[in-house]
């Protein structure tokens, strides 16, 4: 069976032949004993300057042998050098390709981290802007609470100018005191929340700056690695840097590098989430405080309305009684005048009767008799005196009643003035001033 042919892809290496394996020819040293020998002459012991023919052959053969050995060694060296060149070339190409691939993988990792950092920076920037907007809302809400506080304190001060007996601690004053206390508590809460917002904004900016520095380093490294990945053997920008092939003492390991990036992003995300939670808390605080203030404002307004209604009812009743009292005073004055006239009317008959009795008392002697006329005149005088005493007593009672009515009138008029003043303070001063109370949007910091 025929032997399968072998396809040669390169020239086979020459077989080396050791020097000791070459055929060696033995030569005998020729003695110069010929006819032309110089043996025995004066030159005995001295070699001639010419080589012998055998020496010439031996020398030539040695040269051939040395040339063959040198060519054989050179051929082997050329073959080994060619193999070494091919192997080192392939190794260099594989190493360069692997390095390029590793640099490419590093570029992908760097791009991934750079994108994550860019995303986190953008989110932190947006979150910081939103937090600053919330801080502005808090400041507006805090400024808006100054108006309700001034209104409540002004209402309390105005109601201090009420007169007795209306200067009472009524439910309106209780609600106003609740309102002032609520506003002070809300102001303290808003101030503390503003401080928390300021601290959170500072932390957001610090972590954003840290991410930006890391991102800037990533961009610089990405550009460096991108440039390195584009270098080829034909690039003109490459040159020798003998001392570059060493690790820097301050160089990080892949593990510490990844941990640093992960921790940096994790801290930034934690602060961003804390900022988001704080913003939600601020929304709840502003909504609750605005609703609480408006509810308390409505409670105070309702108390004012009820109190004004009470004052109106009391004022109307006082005015009704005053009208009745004035009417009664007029009637009583007419009655007093009638009594005085009646007393005056009784004076003339009394004078007549007394004059008659007086004249009849001058009757002489036995004519001074207690006759029927005398008894009738006496009874008339007694009846007139009794009538006058009754009329005068009634006049005194009427005058006392009139004085009582006058006192009642004065008291009613005073109470009406006090109620009118209280109603003016509550309705015209306080309730009109409360119309300037901020809206829910203003208290929530939107305006």
Curated annotation (Swiss-Prot):
Ubiquitinated, leading to its degradation. Deubiquitinated by USP16, promoting its stability. Disruption phenotype: In a 129S5/SvEvBrd genetic background, males show progressive reduction in fertility with almost complete loss of fertility after 5 months of breeding. Testis weight and histology appear normal. Spermatozoa have significantly reduced forward motility. The sperm flagellum shows defective bending in the midpiece region which impairs waveform propagation and forward propulsion. Sperm ATP levels deplete significantly over time, probably as a result of excess energy consumption from inefficient flagellar beating. One of its GO terms (cellular component) is sperm flagellum. Detected in testis, where it is weakly expressed in round spermatids, and strongly expressed in the flagellum of step 16 elongated spermatids (at protein level). Expressed in spermatozoa. In the sperm flagellum, localizes to the principal piece and midpiece (at protein level). Specifically expressed in testis; not detected in other tissues tested. It holds the Pfam family Tektin. Keywords: Cell projection, Cilium, Cilium biogenesis/degradation, Coiled coil, Cytoplasm, Cytoskeleton, Flagellum, Ubl conjugation. InterPro entries: Tektin-like (IPR048256), Tektins (IPR000435). Microtubule inner protein (MIP) part of the dynein-decorated doublet microtubules (DMTs) in cilia and flagellar axoneme. Forms filamentous polymers in the walls of ciliary and flagellar microtubules. Contributes to normal sperm motility. Belongs to the tektin family. This is Tektin-4. It comes from Mus musculus. The lineage of its organism: Eukaryota, Metazoa, Chordata, Craniata, Vertebrata.
């Amino acid at each position: 069976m025929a032997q399968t042919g072998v396809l040669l892809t390169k020239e086979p290496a020459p077989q080396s032949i050791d020097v000791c394996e070459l055929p060696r020819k033995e030569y005998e040293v020729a003695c110069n004993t010929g006819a032309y020998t110089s043996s025995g002459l004066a030159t005995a012991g001295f070699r001639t300057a010419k080589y012998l023919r055998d020496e010439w052959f031996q020398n030539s053969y040695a040269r051939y042998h040395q040339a063959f050995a040198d060519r054989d060694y050179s051929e082997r060296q050329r073959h080994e050098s060619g193999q070494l060149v091919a192997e080192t070339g392939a190794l260099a190409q594989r190493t360069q390709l692997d390095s390029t691939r590793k640099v490419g993988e590093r570029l992908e990792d760097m791009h991934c981290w750079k994108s994550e950092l860019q995303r986190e920076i953008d989110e932190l920037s947006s979150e910081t802007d939103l937090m600053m907007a919330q801080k502005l809302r808090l400041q507006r809400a805090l400024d808006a609470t100054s108006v309700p506080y001034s209104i409540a304190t002004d209402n309390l001060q105005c109601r201090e100018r009420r007169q007795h007996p209306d200067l009472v601690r009524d439910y309106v004053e209780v609600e106003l005191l609740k309102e002032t206390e609520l506003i002070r508590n809300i102001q303290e809460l808003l101030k503390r929340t503003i401080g928390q917002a300021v601290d959170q904004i500072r932390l957001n900016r610090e972590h954003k700056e840290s991410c930006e520095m890391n991102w800037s380093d990533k961009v610089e490294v990405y550009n460096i690695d991108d440039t390195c990945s584009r270098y080829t053997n034909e690039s003109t920008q490459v040159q020798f840097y003998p001392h570059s092939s060493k690790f820097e003492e301050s160089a990080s390991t892949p593990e510490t590098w990844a941990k640093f990036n992960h921790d940096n992003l994790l801290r930034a995300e934690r602060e961003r989430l804390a900022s988001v939670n704080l913003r939600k808390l601020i929304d709840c605080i502003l909504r609750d405080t605005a609703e609480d203030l408006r509810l308390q404002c409505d409670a105070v307004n309702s108390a004012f309305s009820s109190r004004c209604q009470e004052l109106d009812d009391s004022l109307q009743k006082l005015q009704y009684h005053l009208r009745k009292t004035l009417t009664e005073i007029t009637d009583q004055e007419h009655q007093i005048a009638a009594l005085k006239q009646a007393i005056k009317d009784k004076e003339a008959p009394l004078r007549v009767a007394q004059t008659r009795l007086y004249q009849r008392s001058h009757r002489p002697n036995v004519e001074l008799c207690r006759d029927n006329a005398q008894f009738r005149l006496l009874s008339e005088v007694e009846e007139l005196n009794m009538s006058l005493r009754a009329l005068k007593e009634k006049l005194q009672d009427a005058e006392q009643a009139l004085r009582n009515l006058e006192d009642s009138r004065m008291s009613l008029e005073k109470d009406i003035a006090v109620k009118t003043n209280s109603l003016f303070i509550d309705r015209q001063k306080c309730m009109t001033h409360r119309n300037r109370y901020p809206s829910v949007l203003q208290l929530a910091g939107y305006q």
